């Protein structure tokens, strides 16, 4: 049996005291040797953590002590190795960032569709199926005939809706994401924009892969996950993807065989994205990682977070430039 339980969880619920919850929650995670990241905001909790079976059970039991979190939505999968390096509880404005004020899934949300009813819905020719995830996630796998909004971050989703969807034309819209949380907000947003029939996959892709037999599945490819496994197959097992530690994008064995791949420094997707100075820093970091591994330690550097933030800013700037060009025309 796999050694670690990977638990993805969330709940939209009023947590006016979310700042006070941070410390005791951190203590529970650390006391049970649970790693991963949980986000707290006034609108609820979200995140993915991993630990031994008894540790995750202890965390879920801790949630039950607070009536607001007692029925937190969670999904489990398993892995032979701990997929996280650190334990973090972060305070945020939103537990999933859309950047639109007033969207509250607790009050208005789309219609939930069970995994075993999903195939029938998305086979309806009158339904437009929209993948609410980012483009690098869609590249790895998605549902048959799903529309890719080509978003780099979830913040761009409202603009996609404004530019491409019309409540008068698109009468039935079905949406899905990894675990369900992004669809809670995206369907709430769609309802606010006047879309009447808005559906979303209850429990997300992960629940669908868990419950729908592969021979009946309309899922194509693997599913990107936000932990060290990078992606999972239909059996919810780690698939053949790795991650480039320079750009943090998923890469295949073919990518790693490329002349543009240098472990920890570059891959075909980012070879032209970083300066020589940055690459020199990445090489030094990779050297330290290898030294730490040789000592049986875990090296946690600051470059990864910096790169993720930088990549988001660059892509947002590019999107803004594209939109400005459209308006100018």
Curated annotation (Swiss-Prot):
Record's keyword annotation contains tRNA processing: yes
Region Disordered: start-end pairs: 285-329
Swiss-Prot/TrEMBL catalytic activity: uridine(34) in tRNA + AH2 + O2 = 5-hydroxyuridine(34) in tRNA + A + H2O
GO biological process, one term: tRNA modification
Entry annotation: catalytic residues: 177 (cysteine persulfide intermediate)
Basic and acidic residues bias: start-end ranges: 296-323
Single Gene Ontology MF annotation: oxidoreductase activity, acting on paired donors, with incorporation or reduction of molecular oxygen
SUPFAM superfamilies (UniProt xref): Rhodanese/Cell cycle control phosphatase
Keyword tags: Oxidoreductase, tRNA processing
EC primary class: oxidoreductase
Highest taxon in the source lineage: Bacteria
InterPro entries tied to this protein: Rhodanese-like_dom (IPR001763), Rhodanese-like_dom_sf (IPR036873), TrhO (IPR020936), TRHO_N (IPR040503)
Entry-linked PROSITE patterns: RHODANESE_3 (PS50206)
Entry EC number(s): 1.14.-.-
Gene3D superfamilies: 3.30.70.100, Rhodanese-like domain
Domain Rhodanese: from-to ranges: 123-217
Family stated for the protein in its record: Belongs to the TrhO family.
Annotated function: Catalyzes oxygen-dependent 5-hydroxyuridine (ho5U) modification at position 34 in tRNAs.
Protein name per its UniProtKB record: tRNA uridine(34) hydroxylase
Organism of this sequence: Vibrio atlanticus (strain LGP32)
Lineage: Bacteria, Pseudomonadati, Pseudomonadota, Gammaproteobacteria, Vibrionales
Underlying gene: trhO
